[in-house]
Amino acid sequence: MTNNIIQYCPWIDCNVGCDFCFVHGQPDVDKVKSLQYILSLLKLPEAREADGFGLIGGEFFQNQLSSPSVKELFYELVDRILDMTVERNLPTFWIATSLIFKMDKELLPLLEHIQERQLLDRILLCTSWDSIYRFKSRRAEKLWECNVLRLHELYPELRIHVETVLTEHFMNLYLEGGYDKWEFEDRLGVRVDYLEPNTGFQGIKNFVDRVPNFLAKRATFLRFVREVVSTWPAQDKMDFLNPRIRSNVVYNIEDGEHHRIGDRHIIPIAQQPTNHRIKYGYSDSDRTMEDDYKLLRDSI
C-alpha cells in the first residue's frame, strides 16, 4: 500500500513539554505567515494529486488559536482541505493533537464546525500515548484517556488514531505483560501504530543523558519482534514500521523555516537534504529498527 499523503506543519508551538520533544530548542515561525504559506501550497499540482492531507504540530488546541487572525486562517485552512477531500472523494483528513488539555475551548468548537458540514467522518484525529516521558503525571494520562472516551461519546463518527514510540521502556513493559495492543485498542476504541524513536534535533549524548531508557537497545527490539510482533495478524505485521502507511511529503519546520521533505516512502528523514542531525532507533547500534524489521518480517 502506498499513500501519497501530504502533511503540513503550521507551527511547532506546544505546551505539553514532553521530555523527548523532537523539536526541542527549535525556533518557531510566525503563525499568520505560516498559515498563509500553507494555504498557498494547496494550489500546487502536488496538492491536487494527493491522496490525502494532514496537519501536524506543535499543538493546535491549547490556546494556539487565541489570536482571532490565527483562528480565522486556521479554520480557512481546515475548510479548504475539507473542500478538496469532498471534491476528490478522499476518505481521510488527518489532524494531530496531544489531547492533554481541556477540549472545550478550541478543539470541540472546530469539531462542531466540521460536524455542521457533515464531514466529521472524514477526520482521523491523531494523538499519542507513550509509557515514558509524555505524561507528567498519572492525572495527565487520565485526562488523555477521558478525552479519548469523551470524543467517542460526543462524535461517534470521529475516528481516533494513536501513535506510540518504540522506546526501550515501552518494549520491556509489553514484554513483561504490562501492556497489550489489543486490550488498549479495544478499551479506548482506537487504532495504534508504532514509531521508531529518534533524537530530534538533539545530540545523541545529551539526549540519552536527559531521557534514559528512551532510545532502544537493538537486542530488545529483536526480542520484541520475535515474541510480540510475530503473534500479530498478517496485515498488522505488514503495517508495523512500514513507511508506506505514512505521509509521503511533509512540510516541516526546521531552524524557523519550512522545509519540504519529499519521497519519505523511499528516503528516510535522516537522509533528506536538509540538515536534520537525527539519530534513529538504537542507543547501541547504527542500524535502524526499520532496516532490521525489513530483514525479519518475512520470517516471523
Task: Annotate each predicted stretch with a short phrase.
Residues 119-276, 280-286, 293:
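Radical SAM enzyme [4Fe-4S]-AdoMet core and its adjacent flexible, acidic
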Residues 14-21, 274, 287-290, 294:
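Cysteine-cluster motifs in flexible loop/terminal segments that predominantly coordinate metals
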Residues 67-78, 102-115, 138-140, 173-180:
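Distinct, well-ordered alpha-helical segments
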Residues 1-9, 25, 46-49, 287-299:
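N-terminal [4Fe-4S]-dependent radical SAM core
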Residues 39, 75-82, 86, 108-115, ...:
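Residue-level detector of alpha-helical secondary structure
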